[in-house]
Amino acid sequence: MIGGLGWGELLIILIIVIAIFGAGKLAGLGGALGSSIREFRKAVKGDDEPRSDAKTEGETKV
């Protein structure tokens, strides 16, 4: 698994993290992390698509 950690060890770590931060705080952190990842993916994907407001080389206003 992850660096030699099994399911039992991961479960113990999860229980300790929930005990330290609390279930409500952990849910908030998870939501913030999810929205951050979503925004990052949207920004990365947006760079591949041509922008509609970008001018081409031949289009310059005088």
Swiss-Prot record:
Pfam families: TatA_B_E (PF02416). The keyword Heme does not apply. Its main location: membrane. Keywords: Cell membrane, Membrane, Protein transport, Translocation, Transmembrane, Transmembrane helix, Transport. One of its GO terms (biological process) is protein transport by the Tat complex. GO terms for molecular function: protein transmembrane transporter activity. InterPro entries: TatA/B/E, TatA/E. It is found in: Cell membrane. It is a single-pass membrane protein. The chain crosses the membrane at residues 10-32. One of its GO terms (cellular component) is TAT protein transport complex. Part of the twin-arginine translocation (Tat) system that transports large folded proteins containing a characteristic twin-arginine motif in their signal peptide across membranes. TatA could form the protein-conducting channel of the Tat system. NCBIfam families: tatAE (TIGR01411). Belongs to the TatA/E family. Forms a complex with TatC. PANTHER family: SEC-INDEPENDENT PROTEIN TRANSLOCASE PROTEIN TATA (PTHR42982:SF1). This is Sec-independent protein translocase protein TatA. It comes from Chloroflexus aurantiacus (strain ATCC 29366 / DSM 635 / J-10-fl). The lineage of its organism: Bacteria, Bacillati, Chloroflexota, Chloroflexia, Chloroflexales.
